[in-house]
Every structure is written in structure tokens, then in C-alpha cells.
Amino acid sequence: MEQEQDTPWTQSTEHINTRKRGSGQQTQKLERPNSIQLMDHCLRTMNQVDMHKRTASWKQWLSLKNPTPESLKIRVLKRWKLFNKQEWTN
């Protein structure tokens, strides 16, 4: 049977569990995650990031005390200008 060669990708995705016992150090290699596990991990991470962004956004809106339509309009226009400036620089 042919063994899979280690590539930078497989080396980076390999889980390694290291434990110290006595004076020596023992390294135990666990199975490489399969593609479904990797996709699941990526989706969970992206969902956590998305939730954090939404929470931060709501906190910003809630931090405004009694926002008026005019103050909201100014805030949106400032964000729009900043966004357009970033588009031009990229």
C-alpha cells in the first residue's frame, strides 16, 4: 500500500497532541481531519466571526443615545464616504 506523502497542506492540517511525562516528552499524532470536518470547522469559524460583527454593529447603534433621523443620515453618509474611499485605494 502506498503511503500519502506529507505536503505543507497535510502537515498544517495534522493534529498533534503533545504531553510531557516524567523527564521526557511524548508526541502522539492523531488522525488528519477529513474534508467534511475541515469544512465544518471553517463554517463554524465563519459563523462565529459573522455573529461577532453583527453584535459589534448592534452595540454601535445602541450606543447612540436617542438618535434622530438627521444624526443617522450623517452617520450613514460618513460610512458611505469611507467605504468609497477604501474602494478607490484598493
Swiss-Prot record:
Any single Gene Ontology cellular-component annotation: host cell nucleus
Residues with site note (Low pathogenicity): N66
Subcellular localization, as worded in the UniProt entry: Host mitochondrion inner membrane; Host nucleus; Host cytoplasm, Host cytosol
Any one biological process term the GO annotation gives: symbiont-mediated suppression of host cytoplasmic pattern recognition receptor signaling pathway via inhibition of MAVS activity
Top-level taxon: Viruses
Start and end residues of each stretch annotated as Disordered: 1-34
Stretch list, region Mitochondrial targeting sequence: 65-87
Keywords noted in UniProt: Apoptosis, Host cytoplasm, Host membrane, Host mitochondrion, Host mitochondrion inner membrane, Host nucleus, Host-virus interaction, Inhibition of host innate immune response by virus, Inhibition of host MAVS by virus, Inhibition of host RLR pathway by virus, Membrane, Modulation of host cell apoptosis by virus, Viral immunoevasion
Extent of Polar residues compositional bias: 1-15
Complex formation: Oligomer. Interacts with human SLC25A6/ANT3 and VDAC1. Interacts with host MAVS.
Note: Is not encoded in all strains, and seems to be dispensable for replication.
Role of this protein: Plays an important role in promoting lung pathology in both primary viral infection and secondary bacterial infection. Promotes alteration of mitochondrial morphology, dissipation of mitochondrial membrane potential, and cell death. Alternatively, inhibits the production of interferon in the infected cell at the level of host mitochondrial antiviral signaling MAVS. Its level of expression differs greatly depending on which cell type is infected, in a manner that is independent of the levels of expression of other viral proteins. Monocytic cells are more affected than epithelial cells.
Family according to the record: Belongs to the influenza viruses PB1-F2 family.
Protein name: Protein PB1-F2
